[in-house]
Amino acid sequence: MSEKHLTYADSGVDITKEEKTVKTLIDKLSYVRKGIGAPLTGIGHYAGLLDFGEYALAMTTDGVGSKVLIANEMKRWNTVGIDCIAMNVNDLLAIGAEPVAFVDYLALEKHEEGFAAQIGEGLLKGAEISRMSIVGGETATLPDIIKGFDLAGTCLGVVKKEDILEGGKVRVGDVLVGIPSTGVHSNGYTLVRKIIEKSGYSYHDPCPYDSSKTIGDELLEPTRIYIEVLDVLKACEVHGLAHITGSGLLKLRRVTKLGFEFSDPIEPQEIFKFLQKEGEVEDLEMYRTFNMGMGFLMILPEKDAAKAAELTGGKIVGKIVESGIRVKDLIIE
């Protein structure tokens, strides 16, 4: 074992440089439409919001990322369509919008027997869970550009203007209700693959903690779609929502500048413990890269917290404080 602790940057993904690239791109996007369809917010939240009378249209775009490389290695593609839809739908839910339509973009190196049917199977399952239609898409064969394949999509949602959740309602003392993830979901896979490479394991090896499935099977567990959050929005007073994806708990800064104190966090699944041990990854790096067992967070007044937890299978994990992000004694920010 090396004494060096593996980081996301070591695996090839430097979040700081990525943020600078995104900012440079956004700075060039100065044109703003007026009238119907005009943006209601700036770029940078979970979804873009467009004026549509009494309602706002919400739009997200996202992809599966390098998780598709594990799907290729396993020759198992029937779950990545769920991931593609989940990454978009969960971002819509995080601003209070209901998903209504989806289009996908599939770029591939070559056509392989059984591939398209399995991709379609996953997309269909994700759409059914999300209660929305897939209304189109694009497939491109790009052997000079793509090695393997890439899968992404764009999702459209609707929300009444008065029901938009951008974080402005969050107050000190609000209760945090976390909803469990199904595992790694669809972020941090460049680091995951680096860890597996370093460990000497293969994706076809049995999980050390569950021999009934392989490491590859565990890593291909599809991202949970948190559609039940819509039930919470109808039944409870919700002040804020967060989809915990890339950058881990640092993603909470999209919601509020106030602090998050996780005094009773959700226990990370065994896959995170395995990855941390094999990669010798420090606690801080884990929480700044992965969801660590909690894929979605709801922020509510105390009176509604228990109800929200009941509706989603979640649990009360902490509260809003003045500043910082802390998981027990671990300072994230």
UniProtKB/Swiss-Prot annotation:
Organism: Methanosarcina acetivorans (strain ATCC 35395 / DSM 2834 / JCM 12185 / C2A)
Family in the record: Belongs to the AIR synthase family.
Keyword Secreted tagged: no
Pathway terms, separated by semicolons: Purine metabolism; IMP biosynthesis via de novo pathway; 5-amino-1-(5-phospho-D-ribosyl)imidazole from N(2)-formyl-N(1)-(5-phospho-D-ribosyl)glycinamide: step 2/2
Enzyme Commission code: 6.3.3.1
Name the record gives this protein: Phosphoribosylformylglycinamidine cyclo-ligase
Gene behind this protein: purM
A biological process from GO: purine nucleotide biosynthetic process
One annotated GO molecular function: phosphoribosylamine-glycine ligase activity
Reaction it catalyzes: 2-formamido-N(1)-(5-O-phospho-beta-D-ribosyl)acetamidine + ATP = 5-amino-1-(5-phospho-beta-D-ribosyl)imidazole + ADP + phosphate + H(+)
Gene3D superfamilies: PurM-like C-terminal domain, PurM-like, N-terminal domain
